[in-house]
Amino acid sequence: MHYSFTEKKRIRKSFAKRANVHNVPFLLATQLESYHDFLQEDKIPSQRKNEGLQSAFTSIFPIVSHNGFARLEFLSYVLGDPPFNIKECQQRGLTYASPLRAKVRLVILDKESPTKPVVKEMKEQEVYMGELPLMTSTGSFVINGTERVIVSQLHRSPGVFFEHDRGKTHSSGKLLFSARIIPYRGSWLDYEFDPKDILFFRVDRRRKMPVTILLKAIGMTPEQILENFFVFDDFTLHADGAEMKFVAERLRGEVARFDITDKAGKVLVAKDKRINSKHVRDVEAAGIKQISVPEDYLLGRILAKNIVDADTGEVIASANDELTDDLLARLREGKISHIQTLYTNDLDQGGYISQTLRMDDTNDQMAAKVAIYRMMRPGEPPTEDSVEALFNGLFYNPDRYDLSAVGRMKFNRRIGRDSLTGDMTLSNEDVLAVIKILVELRNGRGEVDDIDHLGNRRVRCVGELAENQFRAGLVRVERAVKERLGQAEADNLMPHDLINSKPISAAIREFFGSSQLSQFMDQTNPLSEITHKRRVSALGPGGLTRERAGFEVRDVHPTHYGRVCPIETPEGPNIGLINSLALYARLNEYGFLETPYRKVEGSKVTDQIDYLSAIEEGRYIIAQANATIDKAGMLSDELVSAREAGETILVSPERVQYMDVAPGQVVSVAASLIPFLEHDDANRALMGANMQRQAVPCLRPEKALVGTGIERTVAVDSGTTVQALRGGIVDYIDAGRVVIRVNDDEAQAGEVGVDIYNLIKYTRSNQNTNINQRPIVQVGDRVAKHDVIADGASTDLGELALGQNMLVAFMPWNGYNFEDSILISEKVVADDRYTSIHIEELSVVARDTKLGAEEITRDISNLAENQLARLDESGIVYIGAEVTAGDTLVGKVTPKGETQLTPEEKLLRAIFGEKASDVKDTSLRVPSGMVGTVIDVQVFTREGIPRDKRAQQIIDDELQRYRLDLNDQLRIVEGDAFQRLEKMLVGKVVNGGPKKIAKGTKITAEYLADLDKYHWFDIRPSDDTSANALEAIKESIAEKRHQFDLAFEEKRKKLTQGDELPPGVQKMVKVYLAVKRRLQPGDKMAGRHGNKGVVSRILPIEDMPHMADGTPADVVLNPLGVPSRMNVGQVLEVHLGWAAKGLGLRIGEMLNTQVQIAELRKFLAAIYNESGKTEDLDSFSDAEILELASNLKNGVPFATPVFDGADEGETRRMLDLAYPDHIAKQLGMTASKNQVTMYDGRTGEAFERTVTVGYMHYLKLHHLVDDKMHARSTGPYSLVTQQPLGGKAQFGGQRFGEMEVWALEAYGASYVLQEMLTVKSDDVNGRTKVYENLVKGDHVIDAGMPESFNVLVKEIRSLGIDIDLERD
């Protein structure tokens, strides 16, 4: 068994009963693959598939001019290098993007050519097409300096859908069937029945029209229409009646309207009897082919064909005419003997199309097309050309209508065609086929579609969304190019004169900047990042809206199994509309979600893994992952629990065709991080999954004692940790860098094998949390490829660590844990367990105003000395300064307009002879309630404006740092090269070299040591291989030096050039403050099971309840929070955490008493190898066992995977192992070892009952009291009501609302109430009067009329009611 570098240091004991058969796929694959397929950057133009950008270009080009003599053809596109890297874009507020250039060819044809078109001239050119944002390696985009995520959209798949209204439209509850053809791009075509069973169609939800108009418009005659939808009855007319061709099947269920007799005259079915199967058999046995029917049997029947007089050619009757006595008489007159009528009945062969045809008043194809034109363009006069153009453009023009490959596949599959490919536009056969199926549905045959089935909803990823947007931009360009192409020849234009890239840039910018699906990345912790990128939303353009989405769309559907998580979704109006991908889900080529299953053949479970989409899954019987399998891999139970077409059934093993790959395949990443999820109620599990995403990274992350085993995957895939790209030995580390000397077998020949990893230090995330990476390797450590070498935010030894392990006691304590409040020990705060660092970015801009330029300066009048002390000569705060609310960070003055001077100002100006008041102080100050340390300052200056000293100093420091970095890299690279060189040269025979070494001499290490290293290259080895290798290394070092010099020069150029700033901005300064937030009352905390609460009190350690050995609890929770919430998982977690800590203490004790290694190995084997997944501890050396043990002494981490976790017996065994009887007795444990006797810290007395105590992984959430609490002194008022504004951002007050008024009324506090509703609120004159009275020392309130009363009066007047206030 292979262990990675970090796994060896701390193995998580797994209780999984089932071996891992399929690894969790890379969690960000959906986003990265989608955008990669969109760009196809790594493919040469000739090998690019017709998708993404390539598809967008080929669908628009070639663009042909209106006269047809000039065209612009697309050849290929290329993406340039982005001008700035990701970090620089974030600092400067730029978009991380590549310039896109397309190679196009302008072809001009000879107008004079008499024969076929002759090319007159061709011009090829690369044209700039705007900038395309690039995706970072972690699946996000940097847009205007902030990281954003494009969320995938779950929308209704293109294709055809049949549904009914569930009886909601008509009062009788009759089902009204409808069908809808949804293209990927173009007009929607709807068919629907009305309550009278007439079939209508509508285009793009416009006015409805009879469907036969559409059928006529596609070229069908009434006869053809009836022939396609009905079977016919044949009649031969006689003078006194008729004979009907007998079809026995059509009689069943009918009531006989006359006696049916055989040839001998025997009555087989008597009149008015219902014909059953026996009657049909009797009639067939009698061999009857024709039946005589009375004349009234024909009346009311509908003719199927036009009837024409053979002699005169006159139409006697038209198709769809009803037979009447008159018509029959005319037919006999015309000597018509044979007629066909439509066969209809009330049960399963309705005459719907015939009735619709009767309503239709159009006569021919043109009239039908004109009717459609009038419906689409009311008020416009139809001409023949415009009518044809509109009709063909609706469904038959590839430029305006695109069903897409998915739509065609879904369409063909639904209407029962064998081929899944075809044209991307509709054909006449398609239109007809859909109507036929809809009529069949109305006749009671077939099933309607379930629109919430995941086979009918597909996912649009970043690549596809960006492609649609890019295509929209290209369409705008196409229009402009068409106009200009006509002048191309006359004006001798080049391709770049024709194409204006602005519409494309605007479309792309709008999509990435302000689309509903382009969201500000949730970067609170690594889990929130990864979840945001795996999110699928039903909202957004072309999707649903919150208001219109019903209950069914939001509900969990059987097809969600293994594709979309049934647990993780927001609470509130978006519930069920925003979902998360399940752990193993992926997208197929059509964009449908699919999930992996193991193939089962003849009840044997194979290792073959197939991905099935929701539609494919419906055809199979699939067993669950927890089905019992014997050693031979056979399903051993008599009956196996399985799923078939969404239903759970019990089947025999032989019928099973597939089996789940893992028990946790149903849930998403966040839900799979909850241990004992199977014991939690779904509502609370939802809260648990959502709240983990809000956990703030702690100062010192601590791994969860009870995890699920997926923590490592999440930490690595999120990109927060640093992984080794190649294996090797750690050569050098410091806080900001790790250097690895690559293994010889992984380094390429002649290349200098050194990898340098620069770590992210104290960087601000989107949510102002701190991103900081720390190395977890030491010099000399050997690491393999993909090993974790540095931890990031919220990770501990390469595992996700969102919170801290707290010793939790479930007991009430003086009401401080009433209603989910949390009582916390002071020790937790003192040890900085939940302290987090938040980085705030404060910025100020100096603009060019009408009155003159604003200036960033230290020279500000009326600024206190202690404030100035922190500013340098440029007026910018020093790094390292500790600042509090109101302190000046950047001094700035703004020119002020000339105003009337007061006498005092006139005096000052007379004395000092200067303008003392023409500028006002607009400095950047620390906002209220913030205390922190300045950790970084960035100064950006527009091109052409001289830099101040601070800006220059920042650039010089950055360049110096970069040069040191490069020098270090060069030193390491050269050191590595010379080391390899020495290894190669020692012992080799030379032809000559420095220090007059004789030919044929062997090189020794001493000889090399005496030489200057650069003279080694002058040695001439006798064998060619060594000589070539020597030359290669020499060139490699020279090349590296050259690269480093170029890199430095490029960096210098970037730093010294002016910065891109918004219009009118001369200079911008950004100051970064690090704020340390300790845990305090009012902060929100939560476990992983939805057990959330607010810290009510931080209690001195001596008052906390403690155990017999004096260990105090860290957290006291209310036991009443468990039963009604039904999240028992937290109790099981506490028990297992208690065992984990106890085992750690025992290992620590063994290390302290220095027991034999063999005994330590035996104890570790008892923990790891007696149940669940076993570990290969024998492969560990003694040193590795000791290192493992020392990492376990704070607790042995457990993994209890979702739906496959530890059972009661295993928890009990671990508790017995952790707390032998003598320890259990000392601690006053119960026999089960689940509860402990606790003592009151204040009195020292034992509590009456034993208490459940153990370790729970507890999180501090991003809802911190510091961000929410503020106090208002004097602040802004609302313009209309003159009441104080609300909210922290507006420096507002608390609203004294209706219920608060009741409270004061109840107390009879009339004067308090009066001042609350008047002078403290919106009585403008009263407010001023109170201030005047206070200044005079007269403490009297003169309450006047509140402004809100005047507003009320005005509103009543606006209703037209004259209302006036009568004053006494």
Swiss-Prot record:
Top EC class of this enzyme: transferase
Molecular function in Gene Ontology: DNA binding; DNA-directed RNA polymerase activity; ribonucleoside binding
The reaction(s) this protein catalyses: RNA(n) + a ribonucleoside 5'-triphosphate = RNA(n+1) + diphosphate
Coiled coil (UniProt feature): none
Pfam families according to UniProt: RNA_pol_Rpb2_1 (PF04563), RNA_pol_Rpb2_2 (PF04561), RNA_pol_Rpb2_3 (PF04565), RNA_pol_Rpb2_45 (PF10385), RNA_pol_Rpb2_6 (PF00562), RNA_pol_Rpb2_7 (PF04560)
Biological-process GO terms, alphabetical: DNA-templated transcription
Gene Ontology CC: one annotated term: DNA-directed RNA polymerase complex
Keywords: DNA-directed RNA polymerase, Nucleotidyltransferase, Transcription, Transferase
Known EC number: 2.7.7.6
Family listed: Belongs to the RNA polymerase beta chain family.
Subunit structure: The RNAP catalytic core consists of 2 alpha, 1 beta, 1 beta' and 1 omega subunit. When a sigma factor is associated with the core the holoenzyme is formed, which can initiate transcription.
UniProt function note: DNA-dependent RNA polymerase catalyzes the transcription of DNA into RNA using the four ribonucleoside triphosphates as substrates.
Protein name per Swiss-Prot or TrEMBL: DNA-directed RNA polymerase subunit beta
Organism name: Herminiimonas arsenicoxydans
